[in-house]
Amino acid sequence: MEGLLAKKFVVAMMMHETNTFSPLPTPIESFARGGGLGALNGPDAIKEAEGTNTSLGGFIEVARKAGAEFTVPMAASAHPSGLVTKAAYEQMTTAIVDEVRKGCDAVLLALHGAMVAEHYDDGEGELLNRIRKIAPDVPIAVALDFHTQMTDAMVNGATIMTGYRTYPHIDMADTARRAGRTLIRTLTGEVQPMMVWGNRPIMSSSLVHTPSREPMKTLMGMANQAEDTGEVLNASVFGGFPQADIPHLALSSVIVCDKRTAEGEVLLNRILDTAWEKREGFLFHPEPLSVQVRRAKGYTDYPVVMADHGDNTAS
């Protein structure tokens, strides 16, 4: 990653997992006091994020190791809640777009993938579209949450995309590093990333999204093996976020290929066809509460927490 001293990066974070069924809107104040980092910028954002297990922290590490000059015009993250207000969305996106407009060699974005604003169903796709209009040739690397709702606008706007491999999520910084490695190889001319993507009409409960269990274990295993062995540059599977009532809710996959997409398309179809074959496994059948309580009483060696999954306790 060394030797890119002349490069300037724009690094930013804009993350929200929007529950469209929630009656509570999400204003900019929610990002300021929300989960993770607040709506910060500049040195304050770098100070808060650097060295943390966040996608923004991972991207800052990538920029530092590359020896690049970089700015952080926006670092915003809020807990899952209702629609992001128009004012909040415009404030965050304007800060990022205005910084890109000043000129840069690459953009590194820590996004969620399931942001819904009052005026846009696809918050991330709209941001990427705005950036592309002013920087059509600048490579854009995006790190995404596993519960992304993938769209054409997102894929068309980005150069590289990677998603979390874990749920509960513990690999946020590493997801950014994976995208960052491909970005650096792109800037040095070693690779020429091209993406293919697709989805299947599966609206699955996030309670069956854990990659250590089937059916997600098989799908994630296929993607991870292809990336880790160099068959493709990056491969990600996204479970979608079922608490969002939007047209593009689905299980999806994005494959980042080098120069040609033939191998990636084969892998993509294999992953998605397998998901469809295993679709019954994405149904969640909860135990009756009485059974759960009785089972919990049997655990005497440690405390037991019975949580309402509607509060996103697994994230």
PLM region spans:
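Conserved anion/nucleotide-ligand pocket segment
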Residues: 176, 180-224
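Low-complexity, highly charged intrinsically disordered N-terminal segments
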Residues: 60-97
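Hard-cation-handling environments
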Residues: 207-315
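Gly-rich Lys/Arg/Thr-decorated short loops/hinges at beta-loop-alpha junctions or inter-strand turns
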Residues: 39-41, 72-81, 110-112, 271-278
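Active-site histidine-anchored catalytic micro-motif
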Residues: 4, 10, 14-17, 21, ...
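Generic secondary-structure signature for well-ordered alpha-helical cores
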Residues: 64-68, 101-102, 133-136, 163-166, ...
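N-terminal amphipathic/basic leader segments beginning at the initiator methionine
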Residues: 2-65
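Glycine-rich phosphate/diphosphate-binding loops that line cofactor/substrate pockets in enzymes
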Residues: 2-6, 64-68, 72, 98-107, ...
